[in-house]
Structure formats: C-alpha cells, structure tokens
C-alpha cells in the first residue's frame, strides 16, 4: 500500500455523500455518482484512487472545533463523533464495539507512560504513514483520535527528555500551532471527554500560554516550511532554514557581517535622521513617533546602512537596506545616504554594492520620496558612464516598488537571492487593481531569471566569493596584491 492511502481517515458530515471508504484498501476517495440515495450505506459507495483528501492526521487540530464528524469502518457501520474543544466534550452517538475499543484506548492512553515520562517515539502526526494493510480501520481511527488528544495536552516532559524531533515537541506546537487555548489557571487545567455513561478526565501539566511566552524567543519559524530554527544557531547558518534551505530575511547588520571582513567596516552618515517634511499624521500614530519606535526596535537611525569596508581584502563601498525598519521604505534620508555613498565611491574609485530589501517609496514623505529615485539614478549615471566604475546590485526578498524601478535594476551585474520576491507592484495590488489573478511564482527570482531580468541567482553561502571573483575580473584587487603589483 502506498503511504498516502492513510493520509486521511476523518471527514466532515456534510461530505458524507461525497467521500466514501474504499472497500478493499480502507481508504477515502470521492464517489462517482453524487446523486445516489443518501441513506445508502457507505460500504456500497465506489471509490477511486489518486485523490486529494480533505485533511490528514496532522491537520485534525485545525478542523476540529465544534463539529460533528462521520466515521465508518470497512463494514459500512457509521459512527457520529462530536468534538467541542471550548467545553472539552467528546461524544459518540451509540454504544457499539467501536465505542468500547475507543474508550479503552482513552484509558490506556491516560494510564500510559506518556504523561509520566514524556513521548519518546516518532512524531505522532506522521505515524499514520507507517501503517500497512493488515491494520484494521478501527485501530487506525483510534490512533488518529489518540494522536489528536496527545497534541492537545501540554507535554512539558518532552522538553526535558530532549526529543530531537521538533514535530513531537510542545515548543513546536505552541509556536507553530496557531491559536492557543484559553486557559487562565496557572496551576494547570483539565480536559474532559464524555461518552455514553462514562466520563474521562485528563490533567494538563501546565499553562500553555506561559510555556509559549517562555520559549518563543528561542526560535525562528521558516516562512516556507514552517519548521523551527534555533535562533542561536541560525545566524551561523546565514539565516538559511535547516529544514528546507529557504533564505530567511536578514538584518542589515547581519548582512554587513556576512560580506565585509571583520574590523574593516567604516559606516557613513550615521547621524542622519528623518524629519516630517509634509507633516504626515495618521490616525494610528504620527510619522515622527513611528520613526522613533523603529529606531528603538532596530537600533538603526534609518532603513539603510552605508559605509566603506573590505570584501576579501578588496575595498568596497556598500549600502545595505533593512526591511525591519518600516519595510525598508525609501524616504529622503535613505535616498540621500545612498546618493552620498555613490558619490564617495566615485571619488575614491571604489566598486559599489547595494543590497536591496524594500517595499518601495515611503508614502509618509509624499513626492519627496519619489524624487529619491531620480536622484539616485542620476548619481549612478555619473558613476557608471562617466567614471566607468563597477556597480553590483543584490536583490533580496522583498524588493518592490520604487527601489525595483530605480537603482535595483541599474546594476552592471544584478544578483538575486534564491526564492526572492521581486516586483514593481505587489501581487495584492495588481489583483485589486486589475481584478485578475497573478500566477503563483510569477514574481519569484527563479521565474524572473528565466525571463532575463538578472545575471545570477547566488545562495548566501557563495555570495562573498562570487563578489570577490567579479571584482577581480573588473580589476579590483585586494590591497596586499595591489601593493605587490606596484613594487
């Protein structure tokens, strides 16, 4: 049996006539005739393979809230199961052998070493994939519900036991699992399950919110695979996800540390700060107050850092935009700092690097922010055409708006990071303006590279060496090599 056959064993009651149980495989599939008698037993419904299921075991927590589910075994016997998470109720509609098996599984679960010693096996969300055809469907549905109940119980002991699989850890579920349960008792809370004639109560070991807040700062969640990356190690891995290799956002300081040799960074224009040229006041927060809050949050004065440094011994002028500061938006100060950097590089005959990460022009400064596009482009014209110097533009995710329309696309060499989101107008803006759906991936670096918009897509771990080779190719050499050549 293929593993995905057991990807889903539960389905909502309103889908009862649309989905059935494969008689030979014990699997769910859509029925071919949707007009048949709704009273017909599920065991007579014909099913087919290669289908997309409603949801799998790992998705149960997202679907079960206050709903009735219809489950059935391969004999066609149906059972209505009711879950009410808010009131912590679990009910089955009739007293059958299935009920007794399920009830026994609850008791065995409650008395198991799981609550006392912590979970030491594989991830329960993926145990269903290891089932084979010899397992009965009843056992599987028991396991599905059992796994779901396990996922709802605070598992502090899994932290202590040092589980290596993030999927079975309570930290993972509290950070990635979405909505947290409302619980005001610090000393713990209880979960009650009710069947006909019996009540089961399982104690939770601690308050979920407390644990969530306690460990949230230790982890960074991947935007692509939603896996957790230990923040302490993420910087040494260049903010690349350990699970899927996705390039996460980096601060400007981290990028400078990545590209510039240690001890060679000399920042420029650090004391330049934004004012409020058009006295922009929003209902939520005045512009100047917003600037102050971002300065405190990021430790930066503006959305770009500029300066001089050495890249593998080669002197370079570099500007690095920071998306954490008001989305990397380009205001008058950002434009002025980049313009001064370009002019300084032209006077000192230095190669130029600008790392772009921006949402575009800053609306709080009106047309002044738009004029920065023309000012920077004019400075680049003199730098590239009159001074005949070398400019490398590095596009990271996201690069949009006025930055894309100006200096982002003016590089002699344009480099993009893998999976970077690069566009002029964002997907949402296009769809709302034109009432047309933007194809998925049409604004990703890989797709745009095929259309000729970039020269290279370079991963972070290779970026510094690639830049070094490019500079040497354009006759910019390390300082020690320059002095030896002069001699």
UniProtKB/Swiss-Prot annotation:
Residue sites binding Zn(2+) per the record: 222, 225, 241, 244
Ranges where the record places region Disordered: 180-201
GO biological process, one term: malonyl-CoA biosynthetic process
Substrates-to-products reaction catalysed: N(6)-carboxybiotinyl-L-lysyl-[protein] + acetyl-CoA = N(6)-biotinyl-L-lysyl-[protein] + malonyl-CoA
Location of the protein in the cell: Plastid, Chloroplast stroma
UniProt superkingdom: Eukaryota
Cofactor field: Zn(2+)
EC primary class: transferase
Zinc fingers classed as C4-type: ranges: 222-244
E.C. code: 2.1.3.15
GO MF terms held by the record: acetyl-CoA carboxylase activity; ATP binding; carboxyl- or carbamoyltransferase activity; zinc ion binding
Domain CoA carboxyltransferase N-terminal, first and last residues per copy: 218-487
A Gene Ontology term for the protein's cellular component: acetyl-CoA carboxylase complex
Pfam families, per the entry: Carboxyl_trans
This protein's UniProt keywords: ATP-binding, Chloroplast, Fatty acid biosynthesis, Fatty acid metabolism, Lipid biosynthesis, Lipid metabolism, Metal-binding, Nucleotide-binding, Plastid, Transferase, Zinc, Zinc-finger
SUPFAM superfamilies: ClpP/crotonase
Function: Component of the acetyl coenzyme A carboxylase (ACC) complex. Biotin carboxylase (BC) catalyzes the carboxylation of biotin on its carrier protein (BCCP) and then the CO(2) group is transferred by the transcarboxylase to acetyl-CoA to form malonyl-CoA.
Identification of the protein by name: Acetyl-coenzyme A carboxylase carboxyl transferase subunit beta, chloroplastic
Organism: Atropa belladonna (Belladonna)
The organism's taxonomic lineage, starting at the top: Eukaryota, Viridiplantae, Streptophyta, Embryophyta, Tracheophyta
Annotated gene: accD
């Amino acid at each position: 049996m293929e593993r995905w056959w057991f990807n889903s064993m539960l389905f909502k009651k309103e889908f009862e006539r649309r989905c059935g149980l494969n008689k030979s495989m014990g699997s769910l599939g859509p029925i071919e005739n949707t007009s048949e008698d709704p009273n017909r037993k599920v065991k007579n419904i014909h099913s087919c393979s290669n289908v997309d299921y409603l949801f799998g075991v790992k998705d149960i927590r997202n679907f079960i809230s206050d709903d009735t589910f219809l489950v059935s075994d391969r004999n066609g016997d149906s059972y209505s199961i009711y879950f009410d998470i808010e009131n912590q109720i679990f009910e089955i509609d009739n007293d059958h052998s299935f009920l007794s098996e399920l009830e026994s599984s609850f008791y065995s679960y409650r008395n198991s070493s799981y609550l006392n010693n912590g979970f030491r096996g594989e991830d329960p969300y993926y145990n269903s994939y290891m089932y084979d055809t010899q397992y009965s469907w009843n056992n599987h549905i028991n396991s599905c519900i059992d796994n779901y109940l396990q996922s709802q119980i605070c598992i502090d002991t899994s932290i202590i036991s040092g589980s290596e699989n993030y999927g079975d850890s309570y930290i993972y579920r509290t950070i990635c699992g979405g909505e947290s349960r409302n619980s005001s008792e610090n000393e713990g809370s209880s979960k009650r399950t009710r069947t006909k004639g019996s009540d089961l109560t399982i104690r939770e070991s601690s308050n979920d919110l407390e644990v969530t807040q306690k460990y949230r700062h230790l982890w960074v969640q991947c935007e692509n695979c939603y896996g957790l990356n230990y923040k302490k190690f993420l910087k040494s891995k260049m903010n690349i996800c350990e699970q899927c290799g996705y390039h996460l956002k980096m601060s400007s300081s981290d990028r400078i540390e990545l590209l510039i040799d240690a001890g060679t960074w000399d920042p420029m224009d650090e004391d330049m700060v934004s004012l409020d040229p058009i006295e922009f006041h929003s209902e939520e927060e005045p512009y100047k107050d917003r600037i102050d809050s971002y300065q405190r949050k990021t430790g930066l004065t503006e959305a770009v850092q500029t300066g001089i440094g050495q890249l593998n011994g080669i002197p370079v002028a570099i500007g690095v935009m920071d998306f954490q500061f008001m989305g990397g938006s380009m205001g008058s100060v950002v434009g002025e700092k980049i313009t001064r950097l370009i002019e300084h590089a032209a006077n000192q005959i230095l190669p130029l690097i600008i790392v772009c990460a921006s949402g575009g022009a800053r609306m709080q400064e009106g047309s002044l922010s738009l004029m920065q596009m023309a000012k920077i482009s004019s400075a680049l014209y003199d730098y590239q055409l009159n001074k005949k110097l070398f400019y490398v533009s590095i596009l990271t995710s996201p690069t949009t708006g006025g930055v894309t329309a100006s200096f982002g696309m003016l590089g002699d060499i344009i480099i993009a990071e893998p999976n970077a989101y690069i566009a002029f107008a964002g997907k949402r803006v296009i769809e709302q303006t034109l009432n047309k759906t933007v194809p998925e991936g049409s604004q990703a670096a890989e797709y745009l590279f095929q259309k000729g918009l970039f020269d290279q897509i370079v991963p972070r771990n290779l970026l510094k060496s690639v830049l070094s080779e490019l500079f040497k190719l354009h006759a910019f050499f390390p300082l020690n090599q320059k002095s030896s050549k002069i001699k």
